């Protein structure tokens, strides 16, 4: 009788015992009268020694990635043949029976080394890509992290609730994925971009602690590393302040990292206001793993004879600068030109520079800086071989553009420590932002966020100045989560709808059911959503969120694996009362 075990269960206690393992052929080496097979399962790998003549005939048919069953006796390897790179490297199974469970076609790429395979090929054969140890461990870690989340929150009396997947389309932000109704012809469901309204309804219902591992869907244009469907930890609590959310999430993430990666994080994360983040780092999701802080030189350069600086300051703009210490020799003119073009991508008019040699400013706009060199050198402790970049523009443009230069320079100078995790809370966000294209206000985060108390009575007088009870969690320069304290009265919610251009009729059409609920004793409540895909990407130091999703889409929101999206039959269209227009243009 053979004992069925997994590869990681092989140990010295089973020596001379009859065992059975099942798995995939990772490696096969034919040495004439002896063949060695390395078999892999989810847990580990093991070496099989085959010397029986009948079995050698079977092994001659076996190729890489065949799925096989091995029965045999566990032996110690000879000392000179011990493989220290394998956990089971001191042991091997002497094969007594071999069954080929299923064959494997010629591989589209090598499993153990598929660096030359295209992304589309790896997605088309994702089930093969997942046999790689690195990829497999990322998916296993994902499962572990989700288990830790559930366990941690359940212990704190959170209820795991499931909000609807078919919801009312309430267009705002990204486009909805729409699902036609067969029963209600001409009507459509939307797939949720987030469970936002429904988790708020759960708070109104009195279910005061909610969480969900939520699937979310956004029909966004192809860009970068976006996925049309993604997973987030969504949670909400009643009768709280933002500090309660901060503490909850800090404890949760501390537990996740400790129990999954054995990494001990600080129990409290740093906090910074949105305005300070923009001024110091040039970003509302700053990477704080390196210094390279932005300087506001508006006051210091007020006396500069440079007309651009004068005009900028007269028009209520600002001058932001980056001081690159002792690195001027590493920046050629072509590299500086490249940085200038990079700044223009972020709406900056241009990027100015100068450097210090022999205690004089030289190059770039040096002639406009030398008249005030003493002030600048003393104020900013400048030294020879220092390089300074300037952007003069309106505040937001100057901050964002110099912030992007900061990131690019830090990357080129290898200043980023990729082995640390820097969490950061950003708070005091503007509640509204002005859209120059539409000449109207829109919600900076979303329309259900609470204004700070001091702005409520004067909300409409200057929406640009209103700060919200809004907060983001940032990890290593990536926005990991976003949340807020929510509006809990119908009157205030309608005022916010009006500011963002939803008159009472539109608000009633889109959100009438929610406004009605706010009239039935809504509690103070707030929450946050944490991107699980992004969290796992950063935890595993992956280049893409595709690496941590079981079956991801490509950059065009399509699946090479199952060829979705796909056309449907005329019969299906007819059932849904739909027709497809052929646009010959």
UniProtKB/Swiss-Prot annotation:
SUPFAM superfamilies listed in its UniProt record: Class II aaRS and biotin synthetases, GAD domain-like, Nucleic acid-binding proteins
SS bond list: none
Cell wall biogenesis/degradation in keyword set: no
Site (Important for tRNA non-discrimination): 31
Residues where ATP binds: 218-220, 227, 479, 531-534
GO cellular component entries: cytoplasm
Molecular-function GO terms, alphabetical: aspartate-tRNA ligase activity; aspartate-tRNA(Asn) ligase activity; ATP binding; nucleic acid binding
Chain residue ranges for the region called Aspartate: 196-199
Subcellular location: Cytoplasm
Enzyme class at the top of the EC tree: ligase
Binding site residues for L-aspartate: 172, 218, 445, 486
Coiled coil location: none
Biological process, per Gene Ontology: aspartyl-tRNA aminoacylation
InterPro entries, per database record: Aa-tRNA-synt_II, aa-tRNA-synth_II, aa-tRNA-synth_II/BPL/LPL, Asp-tRNA-ligase_1, Asp-tRNA-ligase_1_N, Asp/Asn-tRNA-synth_IIb, AspRS_core, GAD-like_sf
Keyword Protein biosynthesis: yes
One Pfam match: tRNA_anti-codon
Location, primary (coarse class): cytoplasm
Catalytic reaction(s) noted: tRNA(Asx) + L-aspartate + ATP = L-aspartyl-tRNA(Asx) + AMP + diphosphate
Swiss-Prot/TrEMBL keywords: Aminoacyl-tRNA synthetase, ATP-binding, Cytoplasm, Ligase, Nucleotide-binding, Protein biosynthesis
EC number: 6.1.1.23
Function summary: Aspartyl-tRNA synthetase with relaxed tRNA specificity since it is able to aspartylate not only its cognate tRNA(Asp) but also tRNA(Asn). Reaction proceeds in two steps: L-aspartate is first activated by ATP to form Asp-AMP and then transferred to the acceptor end of tRNA(Asp/Asn).
Family as reported in the entry's similarity comment: Belongs to the class-II aminoacyl-tRNA synthetase family. Type 1 subfamily.
Subunit organization: Homodimer.
HAMAP family tied to this protein: Asp_tRNA_synth_type1
Protein name: Aspartate--tRNA(Asp/Asn) ligase
Gene: aspS
